[in-house]
Amino acid sequence: MLVTFLGILGLLASQVSSQLVGQLRPTEDPPEEELEYWCAYMESCQFCWDCQDGNCINKIDGSVIYKNEYVRPCSVSRSMDKCMYDLNKGIYHSMSCSDPKAWNPYKYFRKEWKKDEL
């Protein structure tokens, strides 16, 4: 009985640790351990990319794009179970942190970098 209880407790603890917890004040530089979460649902945020010499490398999946209007400054915040993106210029997105939805109004600006193009 004790082994079963400890097993269930361990399972619950592992699930809780994978979810975002606590509050996050508005920031353009979210914690490193949360980048995968934030960038999965709004990948054009500037903090998701390392941009140099006109090209940008995605910090999560390593994809490369040309730097253009796709990469935008944005801030993120979390309060209770609400995760919010602020893309400035009056563009906001709010979602449940535990039931997130991808959202990207700039997806049409994305231009993949191709090795042969120079």
Swiss-Prot record:
Induction: Expressed in the early phase of the viral replicative cycle. A motif (Prevents secretion from ER) lies at residues 115-118. It holds the Pfam family v110. N-glycosylated. Keywords: Early protein, Host endoplasmic reticulum, Signal. The keyword Signal applies. It is found in: Host endoplasmic reticulum lumen. Residues 1-18 form the signal peptide. PROSITE patterns: ER_TARGET (PS00014). Belongs to the asfivirus MGF 110 family. This is Protein MGF 110-6L. It comes from African swine fever virus (isolate Tick/Malawi/Lil 20-1/1983) (ASFV).
